[in-house]
A protein has these predicted regions:
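C-terminal transmembrane helix and the adjacent membrane-cytosol boundary/short C-terminal tail
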Residues: 2-32, 39-42, 129, 185-196, ...
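Transmembrane alpha-helices
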Residues: 44-45, 50-57, 173-174, 181-185, ...
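Transmembrane alpha-helix signature in integral membrane proteins
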Residues: 65, 91-122
Length: 300
């Protein structure tokens, strides 16, 4: 490679080369019609994605007001409030929904406690098996549910455990902990642990420091993890189906009923769950807005 000499002209400055870029690229990039086509294409794709996501939800809500001709609520026949007036017409649906809510509450409480402790340990402390623990936490997020469900079923059979409520709890906690730990870990990654040290230096007990300093700061991450865990537990089918006993959760009951009938009460329950989920989402947005507003007032 030739070395530059004193007689070689100096390269032009970066600003001069940047000024020549429009001439090289064609005076401002692509032509206007191509940019307009790109914007239109992006808009069409975005609208199509939204329609694909929300039209099934709208159909579920609309068909909760349907009075079907037969046993299957597939074809619109007549507007009616019968399903809303008597949502518990089928006792098996009510029992399945109550069981799903009970399972989801227990799984959420256990997973949030264990997942939060694991996340705090992963961020706050250094230990030799930290990489192994991180890998184990990621495995349930990437493993197919049928593989995890069947492996847990094999384990329960080997231990001679009767499948039922607690086997479902254990199975769901096994994959829910990963979601909680990942969510809370992302929240507390930038946490200032010196605040805890300052509280301890001032004479506060460790529990008081956690209650007054640590917990309020990581609470948004814990709430987000709790809502995610509750939704995943309520929705889970494969792992629950493989490890459940005689009693059936709501998704399993719907799958069983589809062989004989699809009553509009299913749409009523689905719409109710949707409205509750939207209410919690709006509440989270409101709380986040209030917190941002307070921080803005403290740091003008």
């Amino acid at each position: 490679m030739a070395t530059p000499t004193a007689t070689d002209p100096a390269p032009p400055p970066i600003s001069a080369r940047s000024a020549d870029m429009p001439a090289i690229l064609g005076h401002g990039g692509p032509p206007p019609w191509l940019r307009r086509l790109g914007r239109i294409s992006l808009t069409v794709v975005a609208i199509g994605a939204l329609v694909y996501l929300f039209v099934p939800i709208v159909v579920v809500v609309i068909y909760s007001f349907n009075k079907p001709l037969g046993k299957y609520n597939y074809v619109w026949h007549q507007f009616s409030l019968d399903a809303w007036a008597d949502p518990f017409k089928f006792p098996e649906l009510k029992d399945a929904l109550l069981l799903s809510l009970k399972v989801a509450c227990v799984v959420t409480i256990i997973s949030v406690i264990l997942g939060t402790l694991i996340a705090m340990a992963m961020v706050k402390y250094r230990f030799k098996a930290k990489g192994v623990v991180g890998t184990v936490l990621v495995l349930p997020l990437t493993m197919p549910e049928v593989v995890m469900g069947f492996s847990l079923l094999t384990w329960f059979v080997a231990l001679n455990w009767s499948r039922g409520f607690w086997t479902v709890i254990i199975a769901q906690v096994m994959f829910s902990i990963s979601y909680v730990a990942t969510t809370v870990r992302a929240r507390i990654r930038g946490f200032e642990w010196r605040l805890e040290e300052a509280g301890l230096d001032l004479g506060a007990k460790p529990w008081r420091v956690f209650r007054l300093i640590t917990f309020p700061l990581i609470l948004p991450g814990i709430l987000a993890a709790a809502l995610l865990t509750f939704a995943l537990s309520l929705d889970d089918f494969i792992i629950t189906y493989l490890n459940s006993g005689i009693d059936q959760t709501f998704p399993i009951e719907i799958w069983t009923l589809k062989k004989s009938r699809i009553p509009p009460q299913i749409n009523v329950f689905a719409t109710t769950i949707l409205l509750v989920s939207v209410a919690f989402a709006l509440l989270g947005v409101y709380i986040g807005f209030r917190r941002s507003k307070k921080l803005g007032q403290l740091n003008p």
